[in-house]
Amino acid sequence: MQGIGGMTDSLPFDFDPDLYLRLNPDVAQAGVDPVTHYQCFGRQEGRLYLANASTRSGIAMLASEAVSALEIGPFCNPVLIGENVSYFDVLTRADLIKRANEIGYDIKHAPHIDFVSPNGDLSIVDRKFDAVLSSHCIEHQPDFIRHLNDVANLLNEGGAYFLIIPDKRYCFDAGIEVSSIAEVVAAHIEGRKVHSLTSAIEHFALTTHNDPPRHWEGNSFDDTYENAVLSRIKLAVQAWEGGKGGYIDVHAWQFTPTTFREMITRLCKLNYIGLVAEEVHETALGSNEFTAILRKPKQHSVITA
């Protein structure tokens, strides 16, 4: 095969044409031969041809290979699709579609929601799974530790929690400090079920634009950012007080790959959680998210803390 510049490009020994198309849906949609595409373009473009957990598509593929999988919070655009997949959300499918229509989201992939809890209570799920996946979900949990333990209790021994997590450096959380072990433990000891005023102020007043390339270029703040902070803080307090103790959807936690791994490691050593960090991948250039796999070791006992 003649590649670009007339060079002969041999295929990697472990190249799988079908997997290449699954990892690169734009190639599949174009109807291009996967072997030809990889040899002429894919290699130079750094296209994935093996499933690994460092990307959204890769971690989805690994999770979908489990005998049974649960996706938390799919909304109308699930990461996992298949007969082996169940879904948990705070709204029914009908309500998700209604909400999606209100905000202009595509509804063609809206899944049937197998488990519905308006307050996000995972304990209503009456089955165990080999894999659980969530995308941009864990940062919304008022009690980070409780969430991890609830997931662990849904996993079979040896099962894994697959996560797609925003990297605070490259999303609208760029102006907020990374979360500390003190904050995470305090939220758990308090039994926090709704977000704190601190989280509300951070989310409504201190967030910035959500353009990853600009963040990667070091341009995280608009010229009007500083001048707007004070007025936004007042509005944040009003929104929190107006909630009258109810749930307001904001980010409670901010991580980078390094601080997330450190957090999980510390919580394990403190015996607050029973999941261990098996893989935590760096954020890809130009992206605003990273991936992680937390494993439930065999002989793991149920944690209720």
Predicted regions and their residues:
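S-adenosyl-L-methionine-dependent methyltransferase catalytic module, highlighting the catalytic core
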Residues: 107-121, 146, 150-156, 160-300
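Short, charged/polar, Gly/Pro-enriched secondary-structure boundary elements
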Residues: 44-48, 299-304
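Active-site donor-binding segments of glycosyltransferases and PAPS-dependent sulfotransferases
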Residues: 51-67
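Eukaryotic beta-rich interaction modules
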Residues: 53, 69, 274-276
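Short, charged/polar micro-motifs that form catalytic or ligand-binding hotspots
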Residues: 10, 131-142, 249-254, 281
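Conserved SAM-binding loop
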Residues: 61, 67-175, 292-296
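Charge-rich, low-complexity intrinsically disordered regions
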Residues: 1-56
